[in-house]
């Protein structure tokens, strides 16, 4: 039986469909990784984390930042910085821990990712959603596709 380490909630919705769809992909990916770990498929979980969390998140961040820049979102630089710190943390700290560490290290890294994503969507991402809504800006973009 599949379990969820993170459950999508309406509370995560930014009001920008493309970004919400991308966030749902990231949430599903974290749940898929969690289930692979529970099934003893650590190598598959590692590959999924690298392919989807690292690569897809980078595409998602770029998409968000491009839209923010296009419309003059005033908190773009701070938002961009949170993305940069996240990527640096994942590459420099979490990936080595996942590659070389124990299953508990992997689960700890996964917990960090869940916590970060939850907080990031619920606060800074919701903030830009509110800003776009206040300005009456409707984003018609499509969600970034999964590789």
UniProtKB/Swiss-Prot annotation:
GO MF, any single term: oxygen carrier activity
Listed InterPro entries: Bacteriohemerythrin-like (IPR023504), Haemerythrin_Fe_BS (IPR016131), Hemerythrin (IPR050669), Hemerythrin-like (IPR012312), Hemerythrin-like_sf (IPR035938), Hemerythrin_metal-bd (IPR012827)
Residues where Fe cation 1 binds: 23, 60, 64, 125
Keyword Transport: yes
PROSITE patterns cross-referenced by the UniProt entry: HEMERYTHRINS
Keyword tRNA-binding: no
Binding-site positions, Fe cation 2: 64, 79, 83, 120, 125
Protein keywords: Iron, Metal-binding, Oxygen transport, Transport
General function of this protein: Oxygen-binding protein. May be involved in a storage mechanism or for delivery to oxygen-requiring enzymes. The oxygen-binding site contains two iron atoms.
Entries under NCBIfam families matching the protein: bact_hemeryth, hemeryth_dom
Family, similarity comment: Belongs to the hemerythrin family.
PANTHER family recorded: BACTERIOHEMERYTHRIN (PTHR37164:SF1)
Assembly notes: Monomer.
Stated name of the protein: Bacteriohemerythrin
